[in-house]
Amino acid sequence: KELLKHVLHQIAVRQLYLQPGITAKTLQEELHVPASLFGTHFKEQTGHSFSEHINKLRMDYAAKLLTEYPQYTIDAIAKMCGIDSRQHFHRLFSEYFGITPSAFRKNHLSSDNKDIKQ
């Protein structure tokens, strides 16, 4: 349990989730932890599979970039989040937030403008 906490901390602090193509195997090798940590044990402790956890972190980061850096293109943000395919990024984002990245940005920016006008 403590080892998994350490791994989750390393993933977050070092932003390892932003590495394109990151897998449980590459992370296991990089952090020198047993491969078994990323299977059933990971899901039991976090409620998500390893890939679901990585995607959640990526989508949270994408949402932050979309709202804080409106000058960045959607493709640039996808790449910054470790996702090379525009289609894959759109699918993941839409599954996670129920809205496209462009609509998310537009909604957030228009709500920010309403706050400023009041």
State the predicted function of each range.
Residues K5-I22, F42, T46, A63-Y72, ...:
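Basic, amphipathic alpha-helical hairpins
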Residues A12-R14, L37, R91-L92, N107:
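Recognition helices and adjacent regulatory flanks at domain boundaries
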Residues I22-P34, F38, F42, A76-D84, ...:
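Append "Primarily bacterial transcriptional regulators
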Residues E44-D84, K106-Q118:
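Terminal helix-turn-helix DNA-binding modules in bacterial transcription factors
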Residues Q87-R105, Q118:
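Helix-turn-helix/homeodomain-like alpha-helical modules used for DNA recognition
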